[in-house]
Amino acid sequence: LMIVNVMNAFGERQHVEKFIPLCIDRILKSEKIYIHSYPDMKESGTRFYIHARNIAAAVLFLITNGNLGEKYNISGEREVSNLEMAQMIARVMGKTLDYEMVDFHSDRPGHDLRYGLDGSKLFGMGFKLPVNFEESITKTVNWTLENKKWLEY
């Protein structure tokens, strides 16, 4: 038995309520995107987003290279702010991003603005993400644009 921790997975076919498909949908409709920020409204929350393909590759790597009884964090290659993510999506779509920073924390005390895992143990074992972050976002956005019906669910 090995324990694997993962967070902020994304990819093709992700439910539209999640941040990345929600951004794609709102940008397509020229709607405003509300970005959760710190109370100063200058800095948005951050995540270590990771594509489902990279998660699957990490699990397969651990099956052959991991040690039974150990815990492993599977994380993305870098920390990305939610604003940066929305800007990347708009850029891939060739659209303008209409957004507003909101202090969501005051409405939801305890809401986490930063999700992060230290994946250095896995990377230190020689694991390499097979698909880089920018390529993963581009593929996800393009797939969603080619399958807009998916945004209706």
Predicted segments — roles?
Residues I27-Y153:
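C-terminal substrate-binding subdomain of Rossmann-fold SDR/epimerase-dehydratase oxidoreductases
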Residues G11-H15, F127-K128:
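Residues in soluble alpha-helical coiled-coils and helical-bundle/repeat scaffolds
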Residues V16-E17, G66:
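Active-site loop immediately N-terminal to the catalytic Tyr-X3-Lys motif
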